[in-house]
């Protein structure tokens, strides 16, 4: 049988279609749905004859001259196809460590600590039931969380406003992935052979060199990566780690302004004189403006979500379910150890670590995120599935024990989902959600974090969630000025971000620019410039305002490029989502030290002054 290589154009079209499906649908639910369907198909297929086992154990040999690699289909999936999955995981880890959630160590401290506890306690509980023998080597099965399944389950059974919980679980999952990858590298490598390993390292160095030489053709990288994979396979190191190592080598950075401008110039040149040279130059210019990490992540993520992981589940989740199989699993310390580790270990480890840290450092949990919600999310983290089944294949040689382990993984996933649902419903009963949310300010004003005009201890507070490109926010600045003039030092005014990307394409960049200016002590000057020119907020214009203010332009541009303060904008947007408002400007006002109430109705100066006077009178302030 001859297999022709798909053309790059065909692959791009397929990737684009998969990405379109992902973008037009709730991708958490959809990817989890693909995985669930594949699991059910595997279970049905495995129980209707012998074709399941015979198909996945079909030998496939790749031979070049006298050299060959022969694996059955299942191991081509587990050792070969899953390399792409781990490559995408590596890209995500590198991105989060460089420009994502894990760059802010204080922000990530709670989920990182929770992830460590969620790795350690399940392994300890597993080893209590399986202290020795072949079963003990499978302790790695219980340490990992299946991000796709967990986020899908969270979307289905989670709380009404799960935005902050989702961010918490995502951050925890990235740390969890790092731990699982390290575990595979250090504990599941057998018969290490140094010669092939050195060749594999040479392959990684070649990829670094290709990047330095600015080689952009994917074929060159594919050839070197394939050779590196073979070298690692022959060395005894699990070859899927090649995907992780290559991903960690590739650079990730926010788009550089100079390269974006250069790409625009090349595109204009092609439009004015369309020819192959300009077309190629424009294409390369656009590619270089975006880091290779983000381009590859965007390209390959749909493949892993909708093809690779479901195929892996189809190849690994098939268990022949008979009365004897279930009876063996019910008596098996291995199966019970997996259930205990994933269900109890994850729930107790993550929840207890979070509770302890939040007790030692009050305010470390994001506002609106309760410990009962974290308990529900921790229960869902017991859905190990993908990497759990992957480690079953690495750790257990006996087919009988492997079947018991798979039953344990599947059982734990079901119990974890039901337990998570029950904990979320219990949380809703103890802390019933109100019909109308966000009537009071969710996150209290923090003078050390928020942007304040006026004394921090002023008796009255006015908070605005605004958008620098919003014409209504711009007009409201006059009202705010009059309100501040009326109350003087008795009022503190707080500005928070809510860029409306759908209607204001420059608002997010303007918000980032204001935060970059704040880092140099010039937030309010930039704030005033941006609102005074709300109809002129292109990047060049904003950089011009920064220059007028005398900012350190190198530092200003670098802070924006690296997204150093993006998390501040994200926090403000999460406030809006959790409080169920989408419009700007949105005001909260009241006496300082009380629950600030959301203002509805006109926001002219006279109305805001009257409302603040009423709040002062109600509080009994002088």
From Swiss-Prot:
Any one of the GO BP annotations: regulation of pH
Chain segments carrying region Na(+)/H(+) antiporter NhaA: 1-429
One GO molecular-function entry: oxidoreductase activity
GO CC terms, sorted: plasma membrane
SUPFAM superfamilies with a match to the protein in the record: Thioredoxin-like
Topology within the bilayer: Multi-pass membrane protein
Family matches, as HAMAP family: NhaA (MF_01844)
Described purpose of this protein according to its UniProt entry: Na(+)/H(+) antiporter that extrudes sodium in exchange for external protons.
Protein name: Na(+)/H(+) antiporter NhaA 1
Organism from which the protein derives: Rhodococcus jostii (strain RHA1)
């Amino acid at each position: 049988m001859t297999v022709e290589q798909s053309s790059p154009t065909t692959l791009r079209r397929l990737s684009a279609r998969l990405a379109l499906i992902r973008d037009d649908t709730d991708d958490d639910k959809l990817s989890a749905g693909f995985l669930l369907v594949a699991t059910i198909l595997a279970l049905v297929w495995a129980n209707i004859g012998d074709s399941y086992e015979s198909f996945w154990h079909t030998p496939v040999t790749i031979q070049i001259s006298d050299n060959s690699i022969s694996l059955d289909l299942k191991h081509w999936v587990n050792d070969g196809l899953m390399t792409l999955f781990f490559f995408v995981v590596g890209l995500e880890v590198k991105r989060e460590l460089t420009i994502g959630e894990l760059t802010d160590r204080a922000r990530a401290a709670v989920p990182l600590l929770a992830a460590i506890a969620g790795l350690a306690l399940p392994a300890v509980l597993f080893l209590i039931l399986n202290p020795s023998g072949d079963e003990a080597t499978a302790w790695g099965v219980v340490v990992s969380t299946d991000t796709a399944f967990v986020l899908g389950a969270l979307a289905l059974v989670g709380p009404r406003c799960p935005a902050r919980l989702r961010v918490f679980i995502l951050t925890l999952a990235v740390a969890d992935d790092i731990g699982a990858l390290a575990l595979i590298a250090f504990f599941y490598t057998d018969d290490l052979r140094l010669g092939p390993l050195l060749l594999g390292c040479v392959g990684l160095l070649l990829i670094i060199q290709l990047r330095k030489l600015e080689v952009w053709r994917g074929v060159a990288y594919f050839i070197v990566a394939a050779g590196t994979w073979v070298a690692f396979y022959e060395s005894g190191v699990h070859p899927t780690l090649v995907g992780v190592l290559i991903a960690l080598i590739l650079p990730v950075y926010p788009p550089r302004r100079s390269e974006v401008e250069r790409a625009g110039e090349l595109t204009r040149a092609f439009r004015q004189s369309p020819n192959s040279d300009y077309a190629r130059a424009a294409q390369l210019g656009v590619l270089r403006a975006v880091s290779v990490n983000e381009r590859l992540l965007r390209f390959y993520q749909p493949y892993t979500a909708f093809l690779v992981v479901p195929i892996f589940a189809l190849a690994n989740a098939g268990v022949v379910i008979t009365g004897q199989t279930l009876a063996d699993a019910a008596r098996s310390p291995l199966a019970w150890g997996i259930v205990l580790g994933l269900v109890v270990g994850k729930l107790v480890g993550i929840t207890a670590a979070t509770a302890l840290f939040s007790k030692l450092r009050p305010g470390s949990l994001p506002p609106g995120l309760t410990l009962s919600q974290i308990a529900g999310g921790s229960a869902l983290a017991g859905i190990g599935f993908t990497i759990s089944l992957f480690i079953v294949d690495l750790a257990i040689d006996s087919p009988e024990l492997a079947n018991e382990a798979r039953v344990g993984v599947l059982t734990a996933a079901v119990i974890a989902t039901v337990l998570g649902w029950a904990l979320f419903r219990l949380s809703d009963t103890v802390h019933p959600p109100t019909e109308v949310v966000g009537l009071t300010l969710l996150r209290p004003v923090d003078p050390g974090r928020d942007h304040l005009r006026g004394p921090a201890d002023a008796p009255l507070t006015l908070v605005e969630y605004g958008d620098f490109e919003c014409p209504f926010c711009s007009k409201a600045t006059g009202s705010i000025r009059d309100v501040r003039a009326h109350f003087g030092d008795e009022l503190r005014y707080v500005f928070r971000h809510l860029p409306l990307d759908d209607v204001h394409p420059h608002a997010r960049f303007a918000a980032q620019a204001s935060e970059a200016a704040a880092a140099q002590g010039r937030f309010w000057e930039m704030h005033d410039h941006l609102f005074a020119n709300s109809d002129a907020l292109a990047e060049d214009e904003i950089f011009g305002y920064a220059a007028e203010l005398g900012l350190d332009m190198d530092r200003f541009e670098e802070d924006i490029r690296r997204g150093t303060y993006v998390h501040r904008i994200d926090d403000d947007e999460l406030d809006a989502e959790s409080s169920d408002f989408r419009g700007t400007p949105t005001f909260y006002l009241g006496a300082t030290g009380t629950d600030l109430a959301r203002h509805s109705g006109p926001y002219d100066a006279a109305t805001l002054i009257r409302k603040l006077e009423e709040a002062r009178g109600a509080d009994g302030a002088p």
